[in-house]
């Protein structure tokens, strides 16, 4: 609801908050191997008169920092604009220096090779094209991943567009 109107209350059972809680749990669970996590969220901001009122990516990062993850271990892809910046980020994700990366299918899908320690993929929303979900999952389910068993978590709400998109 806060994407529609930032004045809505912060529901502790929202998809965003459930995802944040899972991110914090999995961060600790995979700490010994520096396991990394990717968060896909295509519907992430509301802009009115070019003034952002709510940005889901920034909110996730803020809550992860409050939850104890150091800020330098969390990356929001929109902060990395040049090829060099992205390449450096992806190296840090592969080394486990950056443990959580947040972004969209377009920015973190096709051509992104960050699989070396990728333990968990979080899908806060479902892309409109099935091929995009395949690309998202392809970031984690691939050769070169040192994590033998990975987790893919999809977040949805019954009787909403989520349910229809996930065909549940």
PLM regions: where:
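Short, solvent-exposed loop/turn segments at secondary-structure junctions
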Residues: 1-4, 42-47, 81-82, 107-109, ...
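Conserved helicase/translocase motor-coupling segment
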Residues: 1-69
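A conserved SF2-helicase RecA2
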Residues: 131-168
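Conserved helicase ATPase core of P-loop NTP-dependent helicases/translocases
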Residues: 70-105
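Conserved RecA-like helicase motor core of SF1/SF2 enzymes
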Residues: 105-146
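Short glycine-/polar-rich loops that comprise or flank the Walker A/P-loop
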Residues: 69-73, 98, 116-120, 145-153
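Structural signal for conserved beta-strand scaffold positions within catalytic alpha/beta enzyme cores
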Residues: 76-78, 123, 154
């Amino acid at each position: 609801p806060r994407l529609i109107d930032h004045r809505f209350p912060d529901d502790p059972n929202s998809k965003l908050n459930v995802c944040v809680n899972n991110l914090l749990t999995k961060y600790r669970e995979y700490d010994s191997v520096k396991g990394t996590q990717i968060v896909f969220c295509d519907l992430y901001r509301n802009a009115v008169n070019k003034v952002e009122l709510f940005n889901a990516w920034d909110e996730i990062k803020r809550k992860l920092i409050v939850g104890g993850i150091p800020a330098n271990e969390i990356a929001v892809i929109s902060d990395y604009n040049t090829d060099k910046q992205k390449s450096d980020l992806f190296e840090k994700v592969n080394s486990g220096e950056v443990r959580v990366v947040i972004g969209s299918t377009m920015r973190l899908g096709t051509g992104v090779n960050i699989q070396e320690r990728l333990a968990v993929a979080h899908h806060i929303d479902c892309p409109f094209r099935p091929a995009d979900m395949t690309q998202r999952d392809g970031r984690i389910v691939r050769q070169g991943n040192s994590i033998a068993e990975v987790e893919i978590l999809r977040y949805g709400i019954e009787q909403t567009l989520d349910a229809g998109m996930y065909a549940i």
